[in-house]
């Protein structure tokens, strides 16, 4: 009888050990081994938006640093970053290659509204995470229709509504001229702006002009806006065209109050080419620390950023805020992968990406926290207004929440 009891105890213990081992069993999706996590993205390393290519390079640099420190739970991050020339058909081709040939676990930070729109249905049908896309289009936060797609930065509509409210409070009689890219990116900004102005939009907006990404310049559009009598200019353009618009408006003597979308606020990539003296007074929003701001010269996060750039991306421009943006997103992904533990399946990647609670990324502005949930796919919803003083962006006002 006692022997029987002893055998029952032993069998129970063995069963418990076995079930524990099963519980701790590693679960891997495509692209994952005991030593590697393979992910992919496309970036415009060539073409009209090539200024954004540095984002991919800064993310690769950050992951190299993480890998040198031992990786994530012993696994190194292998980011395959391919050029799509800011051309959606090329994006589709490259993403299919990453998913079907390279067998990446997920896509990360693919850049561009049109580019991500072109691959969204494909990736969701394949149940491949389209994670932290490098675009602020509002549609990236729709977990009901697209549960495998998540944005990262503040939405374009939220941003443009902030500008609208600012004008209503400080310049309610403004005559506004708008220049925007003729695609979903530009139209998303414009929708938010008009929504923010409400019933005053029709009266306050006196001119709307567009440009195509393939255009050589936007000089003629700026002349048109000047001729409209606008005294306020909402500049919804990518870096190349933003610099042209700032420079042209100054050179022809048109000096409106200028609102500049956040995707073109890089001092190195936009304002220096335009002319720093021609950029004084520009207003935008910020959410990452600006490496050109002397306020952060002793900030540990900015010092760490500069050290990473020096060691892992020495050819990169440390004054380009696109680089500190890239590293900020990379830090967010590292947290997601840490939360995944040894369950590195596509399903768990999305589960953990949608389970970020008051995450503090040191390179974000003080007070900004990243929060997501299964019903909230908008990680960053706090921003602050900023104004360019000829040398750097200066924050003003309080943190604004969506």
Regions found by a protein language model. Give the residues of each.
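Short, low-complexity disordered leader/linker segments with a strong preference
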Residues: 1-38, 400-402
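Immediate post-signal peptide segment of exported/extracytoplasmic ligand-binding proteins
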Residues: 23-40, 68-77, 168-175, 343
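Beta-alpha junction/loop-to-helix N-cap segments that form part of ligand/metal-binding clefts
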Residues: 25-27, 36, 51-57, 68-142, ...
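Extracytoplasmic "Venus flytrap"
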Residues: 27-60, 82-89, 111-112, 179-188, ...
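Venus flytrap/periplasmic-binding-protein-like
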Residues: 84, 131, 138-141, 213-214, ...
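Extracellular/periplasmic Venus flytrap/periplasmic-binding protein
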Residues: 89-93, 100, 138-141, 147-253, ...
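Extracellular/periplasmic periplasmic-binding protein-like sensory domains
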Residues: 249-325, 399-401
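Segments of small-molecule ligand-sensing domains
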Residues: 311, 315-324, 334-393
